[in-house]
Design a protein with these regions (language model features):
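Histidine-centered divalent metal-coordination motifs
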Residues: 31, 128-130, 134
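A short alpha/beta connector and helix-capping loop motif
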Residues: 80-102
Length: 288
């Protein structure tokens, strides 16, 4: 598989989306790009995304510390990734990594079609795994965990002709059992949702946190995120730490319900599907 060729002057610099210097690159995560506004927390507008790309594609002054570059990623595989985000990425000259739910492609409305994923790969973007059905990996039985990891990897590799070496953990949830399973399945990179945990390696798996991009994040907020001052970083760390404490107190399942309420998520407003939903879906097209 060829390397992504990213402009060397861009804030999004990376020789490869995965071979970035340890701890030296911020990773941004988008979900849906929408033509207009939405109450959904991760529903970023097309105009907003275009402004973000303008910032990321322009030469940026580096602070004395050397600054940070940014890797653009998408989670879920919403069809807006192709219809709205892909054309804007092509215009900007930037590349992204799309972590998609292999079990939903070509089967469920609002998800990518395989033909669309192939077009993005052909244009130099990467498509990697977000699991098979968006089940929280920490809540899976050993057999279901293996299915989520290996089935998605094999499906993506077979359909797209790519090497799948990275996975974005649904909900950002992971633990040592998940890391072990990822290693057995042949992954090399595991992305989660805590950007303040130092990049590390366990059992041959590189662990990397990411910043979730929300609908409230304008260009100035993005700039501060990528090049934060000490006070801003302390505030962001405190806020994320508070969220993690609430999650630990409530447990994954109850916290997920709480998150859905906070994020204004409801069916059709983002992507949360279970294996049985996919098993009962009759709309699969093997040639889409």
């Amino acid at each position: 598989m060829g390397q992504l060729d990213w402009p060397s002057h861009s804030m999004a610099v990376s020789a490869s989306p995965f071979d970035h210097p340890i701890g030296k690159q911020s990773v941004l995560t988008y979900h849906e790009i929408r033509p207009s506004g939405s109450p959904y927390l991760y529903g970023v507008t097309q105009a907003q995304f275009e402004k973000h790309l303008s910032l990321l594609a322009s030469p940026a002054p580096r602070p004395s510390s050397g600054g940070q570059s940014a890797l653009i990623t998408f989670d879920d595989g919403h069809r807006s990734n192709f219809e709205q985000a892909f054309p804007l990425l092509e215009q900007s000259g930037l590349k992204a990594v799309f972590f998609i739910l292999a079990g939903c492609v070509g089967r469920i409305d609002k998800y990518l079609l395989w033909s669309q994923a192939r077009q993005m790969v052909a244009a130099g973007h990467r498509v990697q795994s977000h699991g098979w059905s968006h089940r929280l990996l920490t809540q899976c039985s050993p057999n279901d965990l293996e299915q989520e990891l290996t089935r998605s990897k094999h499906e993506l590799e077979e359909r797209l002709g790519v090497e799948v070496v990275a996975i974005s953990a649904p909900g950002g949830r992971w633990n040592d059992r998940v890391v072990d399973a990822c290693a057995r399945a042949g992954y090399k990179y595991l992305y989660h949702s805590n950007p303040w945990v130092p990049v590390s390696s366990r059992r041959g798996i590189q662990l990397q946190g990411r910043h979730m991009v929300t609908r409230q994040m304008g260009p100035k907020e993005l700039q501060r995120l990528l090049q934060p001052g000490e006070g801003r970083e302390l505030y962001s760390r405190f806020r994320h730490g508070a969220k993690e404490r609430v999650r630990a107190m409530l447990g994954d399942r109850l916290y997920h319900k709480f998150w859905c309420w906070l994020a204004n998520w409801s069916p059709g407003e983002g992507l949360e599907l279970e294996v049985d939903t996919l098993a009962n879906d009759k709309r699969e097209s093997r040639h889409s």
